[in-house]
Amino acid sequence: MRRSAFIMFTWCGLMFAGAASAASFPCVKAQLRSEKTICQTRSLNDADVKMATTYAIVLHALPMGGRDAEKGMQYQWLKQRNTCGSNTGCLSRSYASRQQHLDDIIQNRVLSHGPF
């Protein structure tokens, strides 16, 4: 129970800290159509911050062996996300899918078993 409360407290803290900034990447350096669309669309911007925060929590909570695999999945997801270009529906679905995957890791691998 303590671990669950700690993770949720950390997640909330990071979420509010990230909410004050724009996307999880510097929008002034956005070059891809997908990045520009994320920066210009509030709901996508919010989804990006939430996903990036959850991803950071997952990486810290996973055992070392699982981190590299998750980093690889994130890289593949970014490649897939970028194929959406400026299609907001595609980007929204991509973020929803990735967020669900990360939420499942927190529920099934971290909270139920712990990081060790």
Question: Which residues does each predicted region cover?
Answer:
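Bacterial N-terminal signal peptides
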Residues: I7-F16
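N-terminal alpha-helical modules
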Residues: A20-F116
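Positively charged n-region of N-terminal signal peptides that target proteins for export
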Residues: M1-A5
